[in-house]
A protein has these predicted regions:
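Sec-dependent bacterial lipoprotein signal peptides
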Residues: 1-17
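Ser/Thr-rich, low-complexity intrinsically disordered terminal regions
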Residues: 20-149
Length: 149
C-alpha cells in the first residue's frame, strides 16, 4: 500500500515536471503613476522592442500588436501581445500555431498547405523569449511584476 502511494506520487511529480507545453502565461504589473501615462509608456515599450501597434484605444486603455512570428525548430507560431491598463497592467498573448498540411501532389504550392490552429499552450522557452524582454523594459521603467499565469 505504501509502495503504491509512493509510486503514484512519484509518477504524478514526473508528469508535472515534464510538461513542456504549459498554458500561456498572463502577466500582471503594478504601477504608481497616472493611468494615461502608463498606457502611453506601454505603447512606447512595445515600439522600442520592435513591435508594430495594431489596435490603440486610449478610451478603453487597451492596445495590441500586429502578428509576429516566432520559430522553434520546425514549428512556427504567430502571436499577438495584448495590453490592458486598469489598476494594474495585464499582458496577454494570443497564439496561433502554423501546421504544414501534407496535401496531394495536385495542390503543390497551394496556400491551403498551412493550417493555422489557435493554441492555449506554448513551449515555456518561447513564452520566455517573448515575455523576458517585456519584463526587463517594464522593470526599467519602475513597474513591478507581481503575478504570473
Amino acid at each position: 500500500m505504501i509502495f503504491n502511494k509512493t509510486f503514484l506520487q512519484t509518477l504524478f511529480l514526473l508528469l508535472a515536471l515534464s510538461c513542456t507545453y504549459p498554458p500561456i502565461e498572463k502577466k500582471k504589473l503594478y504601477y504608481s503613476k497616472d493611468k494615461i501615462e502608463v498606457f502611453y509608456q506601454s505603447r512606447d515599450i512595445l515600439k522600442k522592442l520592435g513591435y508594430e501597434i495594431d489596435i490603440f484605444s486610449p478610451e478603453s486603455f487597451a492596445l495590441s500588436t500586429k502578428k509576429t512570428q516566432i520559430k522553434k525548430s520546425l514549428r512556427k507560431y504567430d502571436y499577438i501581445i495584448f495590453i490592458k491598463v486598469n489598476d494594474h497592467i495585464e499582458l496577454h498573448l494570443a497564439v496561433e500555431r502554423n501546421i504544414f498540411n501534407r496535401g496531394s501532389e495536385s495542390n503543390i504550392g497551394d496556400s491551403g498547405m498551412i493550417i493555422k490552429q489557435v493554441e492555449s499552450y506554448m513551449p515555456i522557452a518561447l513564452q520566455n523569449k517573448i515575455f523576458k524582454p517585456l519584463e526587463i523594459e517594464f522593470k526599467k521603467n519602475g513597474y513591478n511584476l507581481v503575478v504570473s499565469r
